[in-house]
Amino acid sequence: MTHVINLDGEHLTLEDVIAVARHGATCEIDQEAKKAVEASRKIVDDIVREKRVVYGVTTGFGSLCNVSISPEDTTQLQENLIRTHASGFGDPLPEDAVRAIMLIRINSLVKGYSGIRLSTVEKLLELLNKGVVPFIPEKGSLGASGDLAPLAHMVLPMLGLGHAYYQGQLLSGQEALDKAGIEKIALAAKEGLALINGTTVLTGIGALATYDAIQLLKLSDVAGALSMEVHNGITSPFEEDLHTIRPQSGQLATARNIRNLLEGSGNTTVATQQRVQDPYTLRCIPQIHGASKDSIAYVKTKVEIEINSVTDNPIITKEGHVISGGNFHGEPMAQPFDFLGIAISEIGNVSERRVERLVNSQLSKLPSFLVKHPGLNSGFMITQYACASLASENKVLAHPASVDSIPSCENQEDFVSMGTTAARKAAEILKNSRRIVATEIMAACQALDLKPENHELGKGTKPAYDLFRQHVRFIEFDKDIEIYEELNKASELIESDEFLAAVENAVDLSIQF
């Protein structure tokens, strides 16, 4: 990707984060932002020269804030900070999450409130642009005082320490720098703190989950519409007149999406044609999907505020004042990311119930478990079990992390957000729910092929079905088949941009009215 994103600390969007994290877009620092960074750094240099007492510059950290540090030890203080705070556990964060984290940290620093040298910010940018991805363990952050442990792991390779990925290989930090042609740096006063004190990790993980959730909301409407085709669903519950008298934005958008997807369908019905009403999982798609749309739209606004915010401490104002506060605290994002997890979980829950309706012969009027010879073959029986397992796991994961707190740092940091846990849970719920929705689409396409009378599909459901069938075949269970391979193909297809693009080329889909 040749697109270069200008970083000024003010205008970064969620789409920019995706472009950098997943599609290799490069970045540059805005010229005015460079001036702001340099002005802020001059104030820190003055503080050190004048031997003023400022937290994290000439003092220790956390409950050690009353320990004074001499000017000659300020550099060692910062390196010690990184070495001791790099205390994470677990598997590495995905590379796209780490790239998002690096980008968001740079964008925060270039606002010019952190007192970091421009050359240090440019070094982190060089790692990002040249594809050096620090090894960051996924666990170990309380979400206040920021994401200290994981961000310390981000900084290690800048010093020639730790580990990093480069061109798909996990290398020592120094080896990764050497292969990328990057020189290591030594940190100056306040720089270690400026690099690791903030909500960047939870925001990076949560930003990717938020973007993916928006795509999943559209996919869930496609899945619901395909289920409507199978069940000869009644279309009156999606009429605009019904929803304008309860003008919830997500509800209105969902009803419109379903109308667009089903336009021209020969399978849908009107009330009393086959039955008076449909079950809630079909009839209430606008209300259920719409509620999640509204929740996720709210989270997106919070994300776009946070990725353009300063979450450092202390901060240095444009007038030269040093303010020690709490912008590092993750609570403003912990609660939204818990909300995000709940909203995504509901999408998985309702999709799993529609999978059950598709495979249940009493409800679908099709062969049991969508197989031509039920009994000899079990068809989609255990596929529904697997979806139920994921949905139930989501219900456990949806328990809010932000309602918990464990005091730390000798009770100096006595109330923490657990926001990084909230973001990681939301990302896991997203993966589970996306699998369920992919299975609903697969089961609906199988069911459509089994229907004795199958009429023309709708304007949006037809391209969805056609593309799906190009990648995932109708399953003849009498022949040699391992169903998990087809399930994986289905998941890979809907995770790609190709599937949703094919539908959106035919009809407009949105998450807000």
From Swiss-Prot:
Principal localisation = cytoplasm
5-imidazolinone (Ala-Gly) cross-link, renumbered residues: 144-146
Which EC number applies? 4.3.1.3
Q: How is it modified after translation?
A: Contains an active site 4-methylidene-imidazol-5-one (MIO), which is formed autocatalytically by cyclization and dehydration of residues Ala-Ser-Gly.
- What are the record keywords, sorted? Cytoplasm, Histidine metabolism, Lyase
GO CC term (a single one) = cytoplasm
User: What general EC class does the enzyme of this chain belong to?
Assistant: lyase
Q: State the source organism's domain of life.
A: Bacteria
Q: Which residues carry this modification: 2,3-didehydroalanine (Ser)?
A: 145
As its record notes, the protein acts as a catalyst of: L-histidine = trans-urocanate + NH4(+)
According to UniProt, this protein's pathway is: Amino-acid degradation; L-histidine degradation into L-glutamate; N-formimidoyl-L-glutamate from L-histidine: step 1/3
Q: Which SUPFAM superfamilies match?
A: L-aspartase-like
Q: Which InterPro entries match?
A: Aromatic_Lyase (IPR001106), Fumarase/histidase_N (IPR024083), HutH (IPR005921), L-Aspartase-like (IPR008948), Phe/His_NH3-lyase_AS (IPR022313)
One example GO MF annotation: histidine ammonia-lyase activity
Per UniProt, subcellular location reads as: Cytoplasm
Q: Name one Pfam family in it.
A: Lyase_aromatic
Signal peptide as annotated in the record: none
Q: Name one GO biological process term.
A: L-histidine catabolic process to glutamate and formamide
Q: Which residues form a coiled coil?
A: none
What the record says about family reads: Belongs to the PAL/histidase family.
Q: What is the protein's given name?
A: Histidine ammonia-lyase
> Which species is this record about?
Streptococcus gordonii (strain Challis / ATCC 35105 / BCRC 15272 / CH1 / DL1 / V288)
Gene that encodes the chain? hutH
